[in-house]
Every structure is written in C-alpha cells, then in structure tokens.
C-alpha cells in the first residue's frame, strides 16, 4: 500500500505540541460549510390506477466565514423543491423541459407570490422496482438528497470562482467528500473528476463513520487501529480509491482523536475522520505531511468548549461546525408554515 502522504509514517503521529504552537495564531481554516434537508410527504397522486407520493423538501446550504475569531454568514441557499414521479410527464416531453415548465407554472400561483415564496425546481423520481409505499417515498427523498449535494458542490464552485479559498483559507465541509457520480442535475457538477480542482483547499470532516471500513496505513481493514488511537494523535494518511464509484479520483484519509477516551461512550467517539482529495501532482508523492499536521492541529484546537446536552455526538463536535449547522437550521421555514403551502 502506497502512503497517502510525503512522510511514510508507520505509526500514530503526536500533534500535542503542534496544536499548542497553533494557539493564538490565525487558523488556516476560515470557511465552514454545512448542508441539510427536511423532507415531507405532502400528498398522493394517481396515474394509471397506481398511487404515487408527492414529496416536498426544504434544502439549506450554509457557509460561514471566520474573521478575527468571529463567525459570520458568508453564503446561504434555501431552496424549496418538490419531487414527483416521472410518470407525471405523460406527454413525451423531455423530463427537464417538462418539469421546468411545471415549476414556472407553479411559481405563478397568486398564493405563492403573496407569500414571496418560490420553488427552485421540481425533481422527477423514477419509481423503484419494489413499489411498496415506503420504497416509493424513499425514491423521492433520494432525489432531494442528490439535489442537496449538487447545491453543496455549487457553493464550493462559487467560493473558488470568487477566489476565496487558498493555502491560508481552507474550507471545512461537514461530512464526506466521496460524492458518487450523479445521473441528473447540472452537467458540470455530476462527477468528481470534473470538479476535483475546486477541492484543492477543502477538507471533509465526518463526525461519525463505519468502524468496519477503517483501513490502516498498510491498507488492511483494522477497527482497533482507531480504538487505540491516543488523544491528540492522528493516524498516518491512507490512500483511498474506488474506481467503480469515484472514477480515478484518489483521497487521503486520516483519523484524529480530539477527546479523551475515558470521557466518551465508545472508543470511536471523540475521533473524527478527515478526507482530502489528492490533486494530480499528489497522486505519486502523497499529500504534504506538514500540511496534514497543520490541518490536524487546527482541527484539534476547534474542538468544542462545551458539550451540547442531549446530542450524543457531542464528543465529535467541532465548535465552528456546530455554529454553522445551527445557522443553517435557523434559516428553515417552520414545518407548519411550509406544510401550510400545500
């Protein structure tokens, strides 16, 4: 297994001193991005004696910027969407043309205009082979989930275009960067190959992960590798690829323990998973280990000053990410108001 970083570490890397050195300096992570969606089944429609659910969703994508230790909203999308079965386009039009026309028609409604509300799009879902009601609903929700991911990619592309991201201003995206290829949505955002250069200064940080899928630096599955990770240490960077799912995009993946094991429920709590997409020049050499140490020490210093009461994930929270999540949630329309539209 080829190492995912320039230093060929064989064991955990202690970041305690590096993290202390970074305290008081301006952190290199300046932007924090979080996306979420709320979905609701709002109706049923019938075609050819079959009943299909109508799914409505609110998608929220927020990015906050930290300047001089203060967090401020940088960008926000709130997008209202509907998901309808493909069979609702019975006239043989192309789906994108038909559903774009329906969206336009919907937005002309006096009631929506009065409220100053617009739907961003209507997303067609293909009914699954197993047409049990729950499964149908899942197909509609999956389309809204895909749309949320596309909106996240769009926001990253806008930040890059505006020249906001560089070696002193990384973006932390909440969650994984392992985006599967999309069959629908914007052509230029569908595959990672097309957009990977937008991710030069982006890291993905996951608060939870499947311990079964953990690879050590030799490429072997090894959950104990993380369970035994000492406080403020990171694992060597493993190289991760999945050609059938992610194409020829390679990742550096590593884990950092930000909380002492003795205070957490399980040995995996208090550990975060970090991903970075390898740029072309890093595919042979791996990602610069100094860059990995700097990012990791910065993440250790981001851990929360408090725990959040009932949130079981408190041990894995990073404070600016928590603030960004809270900001996104605060921008949602209330469930009553949203459902009242239908």
Region spans (language model):
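Covalent nucleotidyltransferase core used to form phosphodiester bonds in nucleic acids
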Residues: 45-55
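Long, contiguous domain-sized segments
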Residues: 1-8, 12-24, 42-45, 67-342
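Conserved catalytic motifs of the protein kinase core domain
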Residues: 28
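Short acidic, Gly/Ser-rich segments with clustered Asp/Glu that frequently serve as metal-coordination loops
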Residues: 35-43
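Active-site cofactor/substrate anionic-group-binding motifs, chiefly glycine-
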Residues: 55-68
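Short hydrophobic beta-strand that contains or immediately precedes a catalytic carboxylate
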Residues: 31-33
């Amino acid at each position: 297994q080829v190492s995912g970083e320039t230093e060929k570490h064989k064991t955990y890397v202690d970041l305690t001193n590096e993290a202390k050195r970074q305290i008081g300096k301006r952190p290199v992570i300046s932007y924090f991005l979080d996306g979420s969606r709320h979905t609701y089944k709002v109706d049923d429609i019938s075609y050819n004696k079959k009943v299909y659910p109508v799914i409505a969703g609110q998608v929220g994508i927020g990015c906050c910027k930290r300047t001089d230790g203060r967090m401020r909203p940088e960008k926000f999308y709130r997008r209202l969407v509907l998901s309808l079965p493909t069979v609702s386009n019975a006239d043989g039009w192309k789906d994108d043309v038909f559903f774009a026309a329906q969206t336009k028609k919907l937005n002309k409604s006096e009631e929506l205009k009065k409220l100053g509300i617009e739907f961003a799009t209507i997303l067609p879902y293909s009914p699954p082979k197993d047409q049990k009601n729950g499964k149908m609903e899942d197909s509609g929700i999956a389309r809204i989930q895909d749309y949320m991911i596309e909106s996240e990619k769009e926001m990253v592309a806008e930040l890059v275009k505006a020249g906001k991201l560089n070696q002193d201003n990384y973006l932390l995206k909440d969650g994984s960067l392992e985006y599967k290829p999309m069959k629908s949505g914007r052509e230029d955002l569908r595959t990672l190959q097309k957009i990977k250069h937008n991710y030069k200064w982006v890291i993905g940080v996951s608060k939870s992960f499947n311990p079964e899928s953990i690879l050590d630096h030799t490429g072997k599955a090894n959950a104990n590798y993380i369970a035994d990770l000492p406080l403020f240490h990171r694992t060597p960077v493993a190289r991760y690829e999945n050609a059938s799912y992610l194409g020829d995009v390679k990742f550096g993946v590593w884990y950092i323990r930000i909380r002492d094991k003795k205070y957490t429920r399980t040995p995996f709590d208090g550990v975060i998973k970090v991903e970075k997409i390898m740029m072309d020049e890093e595919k042979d050499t791996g990602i610069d280990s100094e860059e990995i140490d700097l990012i990791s020490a910065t993440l250790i210093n981001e851990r929360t000053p408090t725990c959040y009461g009932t949130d079981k994930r408190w041990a894995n929270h990073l404070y600016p990410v928590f603030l960004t999540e809270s900001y996104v949630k605060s921008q949602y329309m209330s469930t009553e108001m949203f459902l009242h539209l239908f």
